[in-house]
């Protein structure tokens, strides 16, 4: 992670790939990273490739992170009009978390549908998305 100042605001920005569970998972490196990452009064912004641990398994309630940007689920890859995403490997059919803004613990997650596709599966009814946010604290 890096500590910086943006428009006069003290900010800590970091990134992680995995599920970000509170208990040791794999080699415990994610937990060591997050324990150090949250030890600040700065605005904490985390880039997390995988949203499921933070949203489905509620680990964002454990980690004191203000804002998370995530992707990984590609907006559900295939979207059913007026319904939403068709499938996510973690949630199954008609998943709740495919894109959007979600309150989690004491923070917020912005889940982007992104630009790419997964494993060569074409995007259907699912426009590519780049998220632009104004952060006001």
What is each of the regions a protein language model found here?
Residues 1-8, 100-105:
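Short acidic-hydrophobic surface loop/beta-edge motif
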Residues 51-131:
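Conserved beta-sheet core of the metallophosphoesterase superfamily
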Residues 3-48, 52-58, 120-123, 128:
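Binuclear metal-dependent hydrolase catalytic cores centered on His/Asp/Glu-rich metal-binding motifs
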Residues 133-137:
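Short beta-strand-to-coil "C-cap" segments at the C-terminal boundary of structured domains/repeats
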């Amino acid at each position: 992670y890096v500590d910086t100042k943006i428009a006069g605001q003290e900010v800590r920005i970091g990134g992680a790939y995995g599920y970000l569970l509170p208990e040791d998972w794999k080699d415990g490196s994610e937990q060591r990273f997050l324990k150090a990452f949250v030890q600040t009064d700065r605005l904490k912004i985390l880039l997390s490739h995988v949203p499921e641990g933070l949203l489905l398994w509620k680990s964002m309630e454990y980690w004191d992170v203000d804002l998370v940007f995530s992707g990984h689920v590609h907006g559900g890859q295939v979207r059913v009009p007026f319904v939403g995403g068709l499938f996510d490997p973690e949630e199954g059919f008609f998943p709740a978390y495919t894109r959007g803004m979600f309150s989690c613990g004491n923070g917020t997650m912005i889940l982007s549908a992104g630009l790419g596709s997964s494993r060569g599966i074409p995007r259907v009814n699912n426009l590519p998305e780049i998220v632009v946010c104004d952060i006001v604290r």
